[in-house]
Amino acid sequence: MNIVAKTIPLVVTTGPHAASTKIHKPGILHPHIRVPMREIAVHPTAGEPPVTVYDSSGPYTDPSHPVLIENGLPRLRHDWVVARGDVEAYEGRHVKPEDNGFATGERLTPEFSVRHQPLKATAGKAVTQLAYARAGIITPEMEFIAIRENLGREAAKEKPTRDGESFGAHIPDYVTAEFVRQEVASGRAIIPANINHPELEPMIIGRNFLVKINANIGNSAVTSSMAEEVEKMVWAIRWGADTVMDLSTGRNIHNIREWIIRNSPVPIGTVPLYQALEKVNGIAEDLNWEVFRDTLIEQAEQGVDYFTIHAGVRLHYIPLTVNRVTGIVSRGGSIMAKWCLHHHKESFLYEHFEEICDICRAYDVSFSLGDGLRPGSIADANDAAQFAELETLGELTQIAWARDCQVMIEGPGHVPMHKIKENMDKQLKTCGEAPFYTLGPLTTDIAPGYDHITSGIGAAMIGWFGTAMLCYVTPKEHLGLPDRNDVKVGVITYKIAAHAADLAKGHPAAQVRDDALSRARFEFRWEDQFNLSLDPDTARSFHDETLPKEAHKVAHFCSMCGPKFCSMRISHDIRAEAQKEGLEAMAARFKEGGELYMPLPTPASAE
């Protein structure tokens, strides 16, 4: 192994959130599994138990776990994978100069310090969670997910109150491992979990589960380093990203990705076409199946959990984009369109799709079928090019399913609010209810610098309608490469959208955190308000800008209204007065008068 000797600062953000404790729930079918969650303690005066929330942050928020980035995370799934008896270790391909963009010397990012032999399926076997689910097998991954999705709840003794409109989704009161298996077997959900990513804590993407979010990271030819990208990944999952896509397009793609995967407890996705393009010096016309196939195997051996494949961009669809306002805005879509036009032939991604499936089933890499012809402006939303590609994605889904490969479908894009539901309805019908994974959509084009908001609106809507995972958009969208703070803003924005969608769909546990925070707000438990929020640091900071003293943390007002105009304080006074006089007496008095307010005097009484 050729490791360049140079020092790189390997410091990432660690430590728990305020008032939070990492807990682990054991399995029943698979007692060895330990499912992580976060408990948020509330003040003793509340008389309430801690609030349990979903936790995708991995060991980085666990004080009992020593973080050594150089060693990577514990390989918790390795024994699960090997125990199934259908994989074999092999030497694997060796790193080539082109894998890292021909970087050398000081420009070359060091290789990760530990190399494990990759695993692949034994001859004739499919090692995908879909294959196991179809065979009736409940894997440890499936039970892990069932426990995780229940947010620490035990099986409900009483039917929970359901309030929402699910638009045909069937969210159970309590998620069982068998329900997870059924959803995966049907293709309505996927478990992105490459057998070569044992560090991963299993999660699920599907319409009948909690809405998930993805954060994009990655270097470019202009900026960013390995240390920055690993920290971006850790930072993104700290604030709630469920998956991370490494969209690196500069040098050192292979080595940076290795560092990310070895330290990631969440699924990692990529667009293999980006690295393949780097291998041919950025010349799209020089791409070919052999280079792309080699790149797929390279990334599958590293442990990439899902591939975005733009196989739906077909030669005869390209003319449909000519009259668009913004043409083809997908990087992968534009690369393949350029290749198709130059060679005047069908895309090699489409022509070799069955071979791509064979690679994915040998490592359990899930498909994220790319929307290369998605609209890049609201003027182009729901046009012929977009929906023609969607039809092809539906065909490719059936091909992948026939080979036991897991599939989700990528969606737009830029779509005004009144056209969003049509996207969801068409996707469900065309793609057999495979999970939908959308970028926003952005609902207006007039707000550069605020596209996390324009897209958050669309994300909440399409998540409610049935999208399973939302790809975040940061304030830097269309403007530049996001930094650490942009990543946080994007993640928090999309956590809001996903949670709002869960509430609207009627998820049985979604409102627990809202109600706990509302009670804390009404009772002026300021610290509980901060700690129960999605971003305690910002909430506390905003409060302390005007009321910084510790005494203000118990005050029955904030700087918005002050002590005299606080509606909640006045409500407390009303309640206290009602209790003092007696609720029944007050009710009787109002009933006798028939009015809340004193009636006007009649002419007779005036005399």
Swiss-Prot record:
Gene this chain is encoded by: thiC
Catalytic reaction equation(s): 5-amino-1-(5-phospho-beta-D-ribosyl)imidazole + S-adenosyl-L-methionine = 4-amino-2-methyl-5-(phosphooxymethyl)pyrimidine + CO + 5'-deoxyadenosine + formate + L-methionine + 3 H(+)
Involved pathway(s): Cofactor biosynthesis; thiamine diphosphate biosynthesis
Annotated S-S bridges: none
One function term, GO molecular function aspect: zinc ion binding
Pfam families: ThiC-associated, ThiC_Rad_SAM
Protein name: Phosphomethylpyrimidine synthase
InterPro entries: ThiC, ThiC-associated_dom, ThiC/Bza_core_dom, ThiC/BzaA/B
Enzyme class: lyase
Lineage of producing organism: Bacteria, Pseudomonadati, Pseudomonadota, Alphaproteobacteria, Hyphomicrobiales
Free-text function comment from the UniProt entry: Catalyzes the synthesis of the hydroxymethylpyrimidine phosphate (HMP-P) moiety of thiamine from aminoimidazole ribotide (AIR) in a radical S-adenosyl-L-methionine (SAM)-dependent reaction.
Reported cofactor(s): [4Fe-4S] cluster
Binding site for Zn(2+): H414, H478
Cofactor note (record): Binds 1 [4Fe-4S] cluster per subunit. The cluster is coordinated with 3 cysteines and an exchangeable S-adenosyl-L-methionine.
Residues engaged in binding substrate: N216, M245, Y274, H310, S330, R331, G332, D371, G372, L373, R374, E410, Y437
